[in-house]
Regions:
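RNA-binding basic/glycine-rich loop and surface signature characteristic of RAMP-family CRISPR effectors
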Residues: 1-283
Length: 283
C-alpha cells in the first residue's frame, strides 16, 4: 500500500430527478431543505452510507475492506474482536494497538473515522476524508404525491372496505435538484490511519458509481455529474480550500425551472489556480 503524500480538496456535483435524495425524519421524510433559503440539503452521513455500501459490494470479504458501520452491526462486538487479536493482547498500549487493528481491517474507519470507546477502548479515529452537507444550487420544489395500493394488510381491513381492498399512501419527490458537496482529504491524517493511495482510488470509484448500486423508486434518478479534484504538492497544502472551491462556478443557463443537468454549466477558472496546486476532472 502506497502512502498518501498530498492534501486534496474536491468538489462533488450530483443531481436528482423525480426522487427524494435524502429524507428528513423530523419532517415526515420530506426531502431535506434549508428552512431559510429553500435550498435542498443532503447530509454527509447519507453520502458516506452510499460509499460504505459500494465498498462492501465491490470488495466483498477482501482483507482490509470490511465495513464497521453497516446494517445490523453490533459495534462493541467488533471492537471486542480487536482486543482478542494476539498482537493486541501482547501490546503494551492495548488501546492504541486495538485502534490500529481497526484501522487496518475496516475501510470506513481509516477513511471517515470512528469513536470506538463505547465498550472495550479502541480509541477514536479522525478519518482522512471529511465531507460537507451537499447543498442544491437553486431552491428546490418539494412535491407530495398521493399513491394507492390495490391491497390491504389484514382481513379486518378487507371486511371494512367490503372487498374493495385499497390503501392510500404518500410519496415525496424533488422534480429536479443539482447538489454540490465539498470534500477534504488530509494526507497527515491518512498517514495516521493507514489510508493509502489504493484506498483513495477506491473512494473515487465509489463516488463515480455508488448511485448505480443504490437504486430505489423513492430516490428517482440520481446521478454523479462532476468530480473536480484539487491536488496540492505537499502534505499540508498550498492554498486555502475555500479559495479553490471559488474557482468552480455552477450557473443556470435556462430561463425557467431547471429539469436536467444540461440546464447548468460548470466551469473552472484554471487561470486563477494557485502555484503548486493542480486540478483534474475525474467525472
Amino acid at each position: 500500500m502506497s502512502e498518501l503524500k498530498n492534501r486534496i480538496d474536491f468538489v462533488y456535483i450530483f443531481d436528482v430527478q423525480d426522487g427524494n435524495p435524502n429524507g428528513d425524519p423530523d419532517a415526515g421524510n420530506l426531502p431535506r431543505v434549508d428552512a431559510e433559503t429553500g435550498m435542498g440539503l443532503v447530509t454527509d452521513v447519507c453520502l458516506k452510507r452510499k460509499v460504505r455500501n459500494y465498498v462492501q459490494t465491490a470488495k466483498g470479504q477482501a482483507d482490509g475492506y470490511d465495513i464497521f458501520i453497516k446494517e445490523k452491526a453490533v459495534l462493541n462486538t467488533l471492537i471486542d474482536k480487536a482486543h482478542d487479536d494476539s498482537e493486541v493482547k501482547a501490546a503494551k498500549d492495548k488501546t492504541e494497538a486495538a485502534r490500529m487493528f481497526m484501522c487496518k481491517n475496516y475501510y470506513d474507519i481509516r477513511t471517515f473515522g470512528a469513536v470506538m470507546s463505547t465498550g472495550k477502548n479502541a480509541g477514536q479515529v479522525i478519518g482522512a476524508i471529511q465531507l460537507t452537507f451537499a447543498r442544491s444550487v437553486d431552491t428546490i420544489a418539494t412535491a407530495e404525491h398521493s399513491i394507492t395500493r390495490m391491497a390491504v394488510a389484514t382481513e379486518k381491513e378487507a371486511e371494512k372496505q367490503s372487498g374493495d381492498n385499497r390503501t392510500m399512501g404518500r410519496k415525496a419527490t424533488v422534480p429536479y435538484g443539482l447538489y454540490v458537496c465539498h470534500g477534504f482529504i488530509s494526507a497527515n491524517l491518512a498517514q495516521q490511519t493507514g489510508f493509502s493511495e489504493e484506498d483513495l482510488q477506491l473512494f473515487w470509484e465509489a463516488l463515480r458509481n455508488m448511485f448505480d448500486i443504490d437504486r430505489s423508486a423513492a430516490r428517482g434518478l440520481m446521478s454523479a455529474q462532476k468530480l473536480i479534484v484539487f491536488k496540492h504538492d505537499s502534505v499540508l497544502g498550498n492554498a486555502p480550500a475555500n479559495k479553490l472551491f471559488d474557482l468552480v462556478k455552477v450557473e443556470k443557463v435556462c430561463d425557467g425551472a431547471p429539469r436536467t443537468f444540461s440546464d447548468y454549466t460548470v466551469t473552472i477558472d484554471k487561470a486563477g489556480l494557485p502555484a503548486n496546486v493542480t486540478v483534474e476532472e475525474l467525472i
